[in-house]
A protein has these predicted regions:
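Short C-terminal tail/terminal secondary-structure segment
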Residues: 147, 241-257
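Substrate-binding pocket helix/loop in short-chain dehydrogenase/reductase
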Residues: 98-99, 106-108, 210
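Alpha-helical segment proximal to the catalytic Tyr-Lys
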Residues: 127, 171-172, 238
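Conserved glycine-rich cofactor-binding loop
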Residues: 8, 15-16, 39
Length: 257
């Protein structure tokens, strides 16, 4: 199993879903974890749960649509812990919208959260990682970066941009031993996905119907993504940078039958 002992990690969007799964797993394998979410009480509650379980955890809150808040979140980690070793850019919005019908306001919000925030957080984290001799940045992307969906136009574009940024950053930061990798996530069962399905008018049967389309008999779980993130964050992947892991049950180019 990967070890993150003595590593300082920030996981954005870690008060629920995939982010919470990643942060919890990181804490369980030795990392000092900074929980982040838009609501301070939620972030503090998750951090308290981890501390009660014997782990090292702290919390910071903030709206990542604001560039100054992005900087503040990363700087808070550095100020409290003396540096940062691992950044997981997980926070994202999956609001629905087609390329034809989405408002400019929706487009701008999606790009701010899903693409600009990871960019700014990366910029700030690298300032600490370089003098520390390196670090690991893990971007949480989506299979939609490749194929898109008619009702996820802006979202898909933002995740495609994130993948391009991952590869560019990996090249630019290689000589500082800062590694940048990405996990493109497929259909995952989270509280947020449940909420979106209900907003789309689906009843409780949506999950049974969804599972029936999956060749391995279930949707992804946050724990699946957490294991992959721990690999990229740890020394198990010490010489891997610029890689994109597609965590999906359908290989690229294979259509569901």
């Amino acid at each position: 199993m990967a070890s993150l002992t003595d590593r300082i990690a920030l996981v954005t969007g870690s008060t629920s879903g995939i982010g919470r799964g990643i942060a919890t797993h990181f804490a369980s394998i030795g990392a000092s974890v900074m929980i982040h979410g838009p609501v301070d009480a939620d972030a503090q509650a998750i951090a308290a749960e981890l501390r009660d379980a014997g782990h090292d955890a702290d919390a910071v809150a903030g709206d990542l649509t604001d560039p100054d808040t992005c900087r503040h979140v990363v700087r808070t980690v550095v100020e409290r812990h003396g540096g940062i070793d691992i950044l997981v850019n997980n926070a994202a919005s999956t609001l629905r919208g087609s390329l034809e019908d989405s408002s400019v306001e929706l487009w701008d919000m999606m790009m701010a959260v899903n693409l600009r925030a990871p960019f700014i957080c990366l910029q700030e984290a690298v300032k600490s990682m370089k003098p520390r001799g390196g670090g690991s940045i893990v971007n949480i992307g989506s299979i939609n970066a490749y194929v898109g969906m008619s009702n996820l136009g802006p979202y898909s574009v933002s995740k495609g941009g994130l993948m391009t940024m991952t590869r560019n950053a990996a090249g630019a930061l290689r000589n500082y031993r800062v590694r940048v990798n990405q996990i493109n996530v497929g259909w995952t069962l989270t509280e947020g996905e449940e909420r979106v399905q209900r907003l789309d008018g689906k009843g409780p049967e949506w999950l049974t119907d969804a599972i029936a389309t999956r060749p391995f008999g279930r949707l992804l779980a946050p724990g699946d993504i957490a294991l992959a993130a721990a690999y990229f964050a740890s020394d198990d992947s010490a010489l891997i940078t610029g890689s994109v892991l597609d965590l999906e049950q359908f290989p690229l180019g294979i259509f569901p039958e």
